[in-house]
A protein has these predicted regions:
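Short beta->alpha connector loops at strand-helix junctions that form conserved
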Residues: 72, 91-93, 167
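C-terminal segments of enzyme domains that contribute to small-molecule binding surfaces
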Residues: 14, 19-21, 27-33, 37, ...
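A structural detector for short beta-strand units
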Residues: 34-36, 73-75, 95, 132
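Left-handed beta-helix
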Residues: 40, 45-46, 51-52, 57-58, ...
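Short hydrophobic targeting helices and cationic amphipathic motifs
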Residues: 6-8, 16
């Protein structure tokens, strides 16, 4: 087992500053919720928390430390969509969380009772709040907080998030390709492939 420790005051508890590779999947905290069907996913990290009414489409991936908690409302993860490390998906009753195909959810992003349309990218640490719909092919910049609907093909930045400019067709196409590359990388992490997707194959 590998441990990594930060330089912290000596009274800091050990587990607050360590990395531990888990050897099991956390899929439910109680038998009240059935375990989701992982059979179509490209990769589910061993220490991801995925529980409740979660629908996972073919080629989707849920990465290390992510939380997909569908205990009070459903969550749908589309084909080739990736939920990166530390991201959180949750929702309130009556407001399901939906991620369509080829969506990228960056590290530590939070999506709560929102609908993310096809080919969008949610940047690192961004927050998408209840009832928001992000239009297809959009980019939500890192750290943005989105409280209102976003038109398709929009670059959004800031707190609260505002449209900075349109996304070009070339940029939108690259967002789809980025999700495809993440699918290849996910298959390598799952032990099902050798092409990590981000470099040319020799």
């Amino acid at each position: 087992m590998i441990f990594w420790f930060c330089n912290q005051p000596p009274r800091m508890e050990l587990f607050q500053c360590s990395w531990v590779p888990y050897s099991y999947s956390i899929v439910s905290t109680t038998s009240y919720w059935p375990s989701p069907d992982f059979s179509q996913a490209a990769f589910i990290a061993a220490n991801a928390v995925v529980m409740g009414s979660v629908k996972i489409a073919a080629g989707a991936s849920i990465w290390y430390g992510a939380v997909v908690r569908a205990d009070v409302e459903s969550i749908e993860i589309g084909e080739c969509t990736n939920i990166q490390d530390g991201a959180i998906l949750h929702g309130d009753p009556g407001l399901p969380t939906v991620l369509e195909d080829h969506v990228t959810v960056g590290h530590r992003a939070v999506i709560h009772s929102a609908h993310i349309e096809r080919g969008s990218l949610i940047g690192i640490g961004a927050v998408i709040l209840d009832g928001v719909r992000v239009g297809a092919g959009s980019i939500i910049g890192a750290g943005s907080i989105v409280t209102k609907n976003i038109p398709p093909l929009s670059l959004v930045v800031g707190v609260p998030g505002k449209v900075l400019r349109p996304i070009t067709p070339e940029e939108a196409a690259d967002l789809i390709q980025h999700a495809e590359r993440y699918k290849k990388l996910a298959l390598v992490h799952a032990g099902k492939g050798s092409d990590i997707g981000f470099y040319p194959q020799e």
